Amino acid sequence: MTRTAHWLWRLALCAAVLAAACLLSASARGQDAGEKVYKAKCTTCHGADGAGATPVGKATKARDFCSEEVKKESDEEWTQIVVKGKNKMPAYDKKLTEAEIKDVVAYIRGLCKK
């Protein structure tokens, strides 16, 4: 290979590494944003671990995010519950942006993996 070809390969490798780092960074930002929304809007009922075992959660029968039944639901189903509300959970369509809803759904999914 010529020197030019080596430099092109190195440049391509650097670009790929930078692109991967940017994607990971965006994912981490979304996770941080989701955690912030969750702590502000969800922990009163669902608790820090998502089990719904808080006094308010028990009184309102908040769902345990890590239960097998809930884990089977799609992100779209969870998004609709956040947007429209369900049972005693209020709707958040006027309180959260689409990005915040997406971030909090991703954060909730991560709770069960910890």
Model regions and ranges:
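Post-cleavage N-terminal segment of exported redox proteins
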Residues: 1-31, 110-114
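Helix-centric, low-specificity signal for extended rod-like, repetitive segments
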Residues: 3, 32-34, 79, 102
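Electrostatic cytochrome c docking/interface patches
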Residues: 22-37, 53, 68
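Generic hydrophobic secondary-structure packing signal
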Residues: 26, 30, 46, 78-81
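Extracytoplasmic electron-transfer domains, predominantly the class I c-type cytochrome c fold
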Residues: 59-111
